[in-house]
Amino acid sequence: MSASGFTSPFGANSNPFGSPEERRGVAGSIQPVLEEEEADGIGSEPISFKSPGFRAPFGGGDANSEGPPSSRPQNPDGYPAQYNFARRTSVSAESLKPIADSYDNWTPPFHPKSAEQLDRLKKAIQGNFLFSHLDDEQSAQILGALVEKPIPAKDIKVIVQGDAGDYFYVVEKGKFSVHVNSSGVMQAGTQGLGDHVGTIEAGGSFGELALMYNAPRAATVMSAEPNCVLWALDRVTFRRILMESTFSRRRMYENFLEEVPILSTLTAYERSKIADALETQKYPPGTVVIKEGDPGEDFYLLECGEAEAFKAGIDQPVKLYKKGDFFGELALLNDAPRAASVVSKTEVKVAALGKSAFQRLLGPVEPIMRRTRYDAIKTGVEEMDPLQAA
């Protein structure tokens, strides 16, 4: 569906969000969005509205209910206000390519913010399911990419029920009313907005499902007072930030995994599966990451920082771990108790993999041991993993 198929929800008011072309233009090797008319309508789950601090995933609408018929206008200047309401919009998303495979120099957009604004925005997004798994670097990039959108007047429609969505919004100032029409789309006339179901105030957010795919909005959100302020993030920027950081991290993990003796013969595909399953954990200085005597359950890659291994009865550390080192790999083979403790010397970030996750992805470890002939290695095991008893 072309961008011209969407009518601005702002009507006679000036549109502070820019033209569709401006909003959708992103540098980099981004493929066009392909949308199709579908034989069956796309439904959406019921939405629970709360006030104040209301958040709702405005990403889907009830396409089974047909809106008023649409037709092309007689004049060539634009489409009628109801043109898009009768159309069923498929769920789609842009095809993006990592920078390592495309020779562009894309960098995340950055819009300066005060310390107070950053704190409010961070609190607004940290409880949202789309942002809960982000690491510090990704969160900083997301916060930097949010762009300010002043809403100067009352009754300006920010999103319109039934329209395709591509922006997520955080409210910094003002109030916004939420309306839902039972037909699934906003209708013409004074009653076309539907029922008022909630109010979004400062610190609230809406439209998060637009960051995942291009689906019809499930509600209309409009300013309830003048001089409101929103911060907006578009889907392409969000997905690009996540894709680039995830791609870089996976490549780093795969390089680390190549250095692990019992995993050295994994294929590239197997390493990529393991890399995707690694879970990032952070520990402040002085934290016991692994305790001597505990059963060996997890294998760790050290992303950054330093950690030390200690054994009971020995005052000095038996080993120092730095970025790129690994420990606890024999936990993938058995559940024997740890023979040493690992304590973070500085703040550390590790990537952890449990034995159960490893077996779920690649099956039993024994075939891999046969591949590497790890059973035959009897000497030097303590040097490779001082956490495992001899």
Curated annotation (Swiss-Prot):
InterPro entries (UniProt xref): cAMP-dep_PK_reg_su-like, cAMP_dep_PK_reg_su, cNMP-bd_CS, cNMP-bd_dom, cNMP-bd_dom_sf, RmlC-like_jellyroll
Residues carrying Phosphoserine: S90
GO molecular function: cAMP binding; cAMP-dependent protein kinase inhibitor activity; protein kinase A catalytic subunit binding
Region (Dimerization and phosphorylation) location: 1-129
Keywords attached to this entry: cAMP, cAMP-binding, Nucleotide-binding, Phosphoprotein, Repeat
Record's compositionally biased regions (Polar residues): 1-17
Region (Disordered): 1-81
An annotated GO cellular component: cAMP-dependent protein kinase complex
Entries under SMART domains matching the protein: cNMP
PROSITE patterns, per database record: CNMP_BINDING_1, CNMP_BINDING_2, CNMP_BINDING_3
Binding site for 3',5'-cyclic AMP 2: 262-383
Residue sites binding 3',5'-cyclic AMP 1 per the record: 130-261
Protein family according to the UniProt entry: Belongs to the cAMP-dependent kinase regulatory chain family.
Subunit structure: Tetramer, composed of 2 regulatory (R) and 2 catalytic (C) subunits. In the presence of cAMP it dissociates into 2 active monomeric C subunits and an R dimer.
Protein name per Swiss-Prot or TrEMBL: cAMP-dependent protein kinase regulatory subunit
Gene (UniProt): SUM1
